[in-house]
């Protein structure tokens, strides 16, 4: 029987070589995805119609596709040459093309010298349809999520294991460990990981750490979309997008995340309706009994209580649990997405900065809850205390690779320093040894009597492993300009202030607070207690209903909003952003200002939209400090910042000569900066004399009373 390639050549003798290669590639690599001739027609039919011109109609194209489909099906049992082959290592196409001088150019990227007979747009559409079909198939076995993930620029390549592939295809792979070896991850033209390995043992809790912009979030997305090969029998959930707005009550939304329970209950209702109508069959009665047994096995009757406990821990009151999801803000819907993931209990839970959406109380509850988590967790977090509480292992992303460490974050810091020290010693020792041998070679290179010894030394050098110098991460330095004159109190105060949006729901009653240029005030409290509202009253953005706001005439406030990204123009570069905000200054001044916060070189010229969350925050800091304020009001400034930048921010605030009031949920950052702790609750603000230790103890006691501990 003719092969697919022979069929194409005979039916389309004028076919362009590039199109021929593309079509045969689709046929061989996607043969397993073609369940019928319709699938094959959908994948390549439009292209073949374009190639044929007027020589074949739709029926003719379909007949050709039918022949090729039959060939593929018959070739499946014995074919070796046309099946997919797992590579021993990733292949970089750019490296391959460097070796060819024949002038071949990639389609769609370079203009061809000769004209093509194929419509490029149709070629792209065909590729997109095939890719969408493959992605849809790979996602069938994942748990239900509120929204699909979309990756437009990220890509991955991975060396395959024939043994693991055979186990997976045979259905005999029962391990819940995730082992991915020798893989690359790129974002656009940037290589984020090269030849990396990741091993996630079943039941372990992993913290993924690294500097902003290195690819932590991209790695999670690659795992979530199975662009990196995760065994199909392992269920996974990635908490990334907030729950959709609709009329579903919050509690019901959480219950629906358990697809197994929902499917059993739906089938149970159908069978019960048949029985009630007297239309039951013998097999249905047996099926109903089996469903009841499965529901009992998964403790379906206890599910509402378990979902309610999770929601309560994340701050949802009984009343809020019955509210439709459309009535919640984006932050609360993100909490709801986290609650759904915790309730569904996937085999692999992927969390990206889960503490960003939570207040201190909810973070402490989540720490306690995750410590008894039965399956595997991989969490990206820059909250040092949170990682110390929940992580049993740390994965460090740096220098385009992943290094694993046993223990919590503090253990990781010590182990990393020891590893770097040992690597540096080993490198220096080898350099000295190499130099010693090289001196001998140089001295006796032209001495005939020593020729054999020189050759021996040269072979020794060749056999030495090539050690690279230790790649040390640069220190993060931040500095807030403070070239201003000090002035005497009162600086900023609220006196007997009442505030509300609706008289039925008073937020503050008789609020009196004050701050000066020596203040380092940290504000904590549950979400919705009024923390951000109080900051806006201090800023003067909101006017008190009653009472007085007093601000010194020389006071110049710099404000950092927790929604700072919404205030940035994402379509321009960071340099252009500052130039529009503060026109008339030389470009070097904008670059210098951005460089203070780690946005330098090509980063400063890239569109802000292409920067990571932490890099966007740094741009916002550069913009905020450009006018040289003497007082800062910061609302969740550590969100999206890496740990090194958080430490640098804390040091910069401590060295700043002006005043600071900030809202934060990051325990370490609060301890680093705070001299005074305010708690927003019950329509007022309470000063906690014992600082964060006292506040944490109060929350733990509250958990015990409520039965969370």
UniProtKB/Swiss-Prot annotation:
Residues 129-171 are annotated as: Disordered. GO terms for molecular function: ATP binding; ATP hydrolysis activity. One of its GO terms (biological process) is defense response to virus. Residues 129-143, 161-171 have a biased composition (Basic and acidic residues). The keyword Electron transport does not apply. The lineage of its organism: Eukaryota, Metazoa, Chordata, Craniata, Vertebrata. The modification N-acetylalanine is found at residue 2. Displays an antiviral effect against flaviviruses in the presence of OAS1B. ATP 1 binds at residues 210-217. The modification Phosphoserine is found at residues 83, 155, 157, 161, 283. This is ATP-binding cassette sub-family F member 3. Residues 178-424, 492-707 form the ABC transporter domain. ATP 2 binds at residues 525-532. Belongs to the ABC transporter superfamily. ABCF family. EF3 subfamily. Keywords: Acetylation, Antiviral defense, ATP-binding, Nucleotide-binding, Phosphoprotein, Repeat. PROSITE patterns: ABC_TRANSPORTER_1, ABC_TRANSPORTER_2. The keyword NADP does not apply. Pfam families: ABC_tran, ABC_tran_Xtn.
